Amino acid sequence: MALYPFTAIVGQTEMIRAMLIATVEPTLGGVLAFGDRGTGKSTAVRALAALLPTMRAVAGCRYHCDPAARSALCPECRNRRAAGRLASERVRIPVVDLPLGATEDRVVGALDLERALADGVKAFEPGLLARAHRGFLYIDEINLLEDHLVDLLLDVAASGENVVEREGLSLRHPARFVLIGSGNPEEGELRPQLLDRFGLCVEVKTPTDLDQRIEVVRRRDAFEHDQAGFTRRFAADEAALRRQLVTAMKLLPLVSVPEAILRLAAKLCIELGTDGLRGELTLLRAARAEAALEGDTVVTESHLRAVAPAALRHRLRRDPLDESLAGARVERAMAALFSQAAIAR
């Protein structure tokens, strides 16, 4: 079954840009897309899976270990490297779904019962966290996820490692992934501890523009009638965007942040009253990725402005005297701050 092309998605520019930024800068902390039902959140994530470039991994490794990252190899790859046998291959960057009904064993991994019964061997069967290593872990309706799984994800996200202690097994393996969550806020709030772990938070709304709504329906109908033909129509656009991603990934280490931009980012977070320093760090990482996507090697005010709402809206304290949306508060603070900076120059 063909996947809907990423470049065929109409509108939702903030969500699409956030996913591209998280692809270029995986250490950002992932993307949370909250909004109305039927607005393309799940479609965008699955379309991203087909768009992503390949990566180099240890051949045959169940965790897609990076052969160049010696300190982050799984136990099997460390043993193979010590024996001098560490061949590599190109594989697709994984995008793994974590369903709401998943058990803890399915998420973290468990004893391979088939091998245990057949051969009497205690072998580990990797879970979803292992499959998502160096890729993306997607959770739809993340605000409905069970609390014990939320705690588990927080632990793994903080350490970058999955520790399994059960049924006589004691094992740890790398588990670094970009977390993408989606949901409808009407169905429940997200726990603050998990909310703060997301690098970017985007608001996804039902389109109100008539022409845009018509184009969404037209494209979806065309895709369902002829998936192969519709996919071919956007093949060139998909290839061009994939090349842009690869170029941005290579450019990212060369992107610098001037002192003036660093000061602006810090002032913006102070003005908005964000807790801790995670806001500034995320803001700068996102701005660097935005610059890399644009082909620039220096972060500017425009890059900062482009990513600030998504990087900061979920870090604001609720103000009972200001009922405006968090994104609007960020926009107001930016407008005031950048106008002051312009006057100072």
From Swiss-Prot:
Q: Which SMART domains match?
A: AAA
The pathway this protein participates in, as annotated, is: Porphyrin-containing compound metabolism; bacteriochlorophyll biosynthesis
Provide the function of this protein.
Involved in bacteriochlorophyll biosynthesis; introduces a magnesium ion into protoporphyrin IX to yield Mg-protoporphyrin IX.
What's one Pfam family here? Mg_chelatase
Highest rank taxon of the organism: Bacteria
Catalysed reaction, written as an equation: protoporphyrin IX + Mg(2+) + ATP + H2O = Mg-protoporphyrin IX + ADP + phosphate + 3 H(+)
Record-linked PANTHER family: MAGNESIUM-CHELATASE SUBUNIT CHLI, MAGNESIUM-CHELATASE SUBUNIT CHLI-2, CHLOROPLASTIC
EC no. given is: 6.6.1.1
Its family?
A: Belongs to the Mg-chelatase subunits D/I family.
Q: Offer one example of a GO biological process linked to this entry.
A: bacteriochlorophyll biosynthetic process
Name the keywords, alphabetized. Answer: ATP-binding, Bacteriochlorophyll biosynthesis, Chlorophyll biosynthesis, Ligase, Nucleotide-binding, Photosynthesis
- UniProt keyword annotation of Glycoprotein present: no
Q: What is this protein called?
A: Magnesium-chelatase 38 kDa subunit
One GO MF term attached to the UniProt entry = magnesium chelatase activity
Binding-site residues, ATP = G35, D36, R37, G38, T39, G40, K41, S42
